[in-house]
């Protein structure tokens, strides 16, 4: 595992709902960082006060890594390649876009991305290598 760790939205939501990753997260080696894309996804889905407080606390607890201009441009190229290879509809590509940005941000910072969304991130990894751990 790399020195820097990013948790994907899936891991954070699973843990918030069921505490299923609490022990592993507490024992996680490396410096945990937040992704601005993950935080945006969490804010988008926060519908009650407890969820908003969770995101606010998370946002304030660690440094935030944000996709660069290069990451944004590269994400379009990756999604175009996925569309050409897999024939995905625009809605599926929109769903994948944030995941591609999260993966590219992790790659740019030499971070390990931890997710429970195996299918999407393993697909993305076929187009750009990055350190991935599945929980």
Q: What residues fall within each predicted segment?
A:
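Short, well-structured N-terminal submotif of metal-dependent ribonuclease cores
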Residues: 1-62
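Histidine- and aromatic-rich ligand-binding microenvironments
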Residues: 7-8, 34-35, 94-96, 117-118, ...
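Residue-level signal for well-ordered alpha-helical positions
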Residues: 18-19, 45, 78, 124-127
